[in-house]
Structure formats: C-alpha cells, structure tokens
Design a protein with these regions (language model features):
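Membrane-interface amphipathic segments in extracytoplasmic regions
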Residues: 1-175
C-alpha cells in the first residue's frame, strides 16, 4: 500500500497482480511523509546486492496499521475508514486487476510453493519404480485448490458495490 501525499495518490495493492512490482516502482518517487508498507522478506523482494527492491517508509506512523494484521494489502473499506476524508476523496486511487484465470494459476503456485501435500511426489514414486503421471496429480491438486474457493480482489477497488478506484490498470496490458 502506498499513501503518497507528495503526489496525491493512494495505491490500493491487490493480490497476485504484480502489485509488488508496481509498488516497488512507485515507491522510488516517494519521500517526506509518504507511506509505503514494508514487503515480506522474501528473496524475490531483494535486488542482486540483497537490498530491498522498494523504499518502505513511515508505515509505523499510522496508528491503525499493523504489519501482522493488515500487512501490505490494505482494502478500500479499511483505508477509507482510517484516512482523513480529504485524502480519501481528494487523492487519485490506483489499483491493478488481472485476468481471473491467470490470477488463480499464479495464486495456486504461490500458495502451494511450500506445501508438500500439493506437490507431485515424483521422486518417491520413481524410486519405487512405479509409473507416475505428474501432470494428472498436479491437475487434481489444482482442481482441489480451485474448488475450495478463493477471494477476489474486489475489496481493494470496489466499495459499497461501486468502483472506488480512479484508475485500474490491467495486468495483461502492462509491458
């Protein structure tokens, strides 16, 4: 999430839509009392020298923000509730949307990256000399994942049934 007082915009960061990349790029022009929430400490959030890919700043100055409970994805109702009306109404609200199919595939890969029960057990089965259909198992795991249901990103840019973001960038149209 970014609250840029210097440029008068709010970045409503969605999930699995290149939000971190956009936030990293936007954060480079933030300064002063702008707010940029910190990223989780994953290796892909660091550059080749090990430094952070974006400038986290001032998030701890927000009395309502808590890294463990709110994190870097702050939905529209929460932001509206906590920001002064002149900021919520007067700043440009930016967000990003992604094709739902691409997003769910990305979400599946992200959520299951460390879940051994969702990964094909190819090595074990090959050691036993049993033929293995890795693609079939992956498909079954993906179907199970999709059937559990997943949250949309609507809460970040839709408020009271209406689009509240002034600009919604389509992931597929970025280059």
């Amino acid at each position: 999430m970014i609250i840029s007082h210097s440029h008068k915009y709010l970045f409503l960061k969605t999930v699995k839509t290149a939000g971190t990349s956009i936030e990293a790029a936007l954060s480079q022009s933030c300064s002063g009392n702008d707010v940029v929430t910190p990223l989780n400490d994953f290796s892909h959030n660091r550059d080749e020298t090990g430094g952070a890919v974006h400038r986290a700043m001032n998030a701890d100055t927000l009395p309502w923000w808590n890294r463990d409970q709110i994190g870097q994805h702050v939905d529209a109702p929460t932001m509206k509730r906590h920001l002064p009306p002149e900021v919520w109404q007067g700043y440009c609200k930016l967000s990003i949307a992604r094709n739902p199919w691409d997003r769910i595939v990305s979400l599946f890969a992200w959520k299951t990256r460390n879940d051994a029960t969702m990964k094909p057990q190819k090595r074990l089965i090959h050691r036993l000399g049993v033929p293995f259909d890795e693609l079939g198992e992956l498909r079954r795991n993906f179907t199970t994942f999709v059937n559990r249901g997943f949250e949309t990103n609507d809460r970040f840019y839709i408020l009271d049934g209406e689009l509240c973001a002034d600009v919604v960038v389509r992931y597929e149209q970025m280059n």
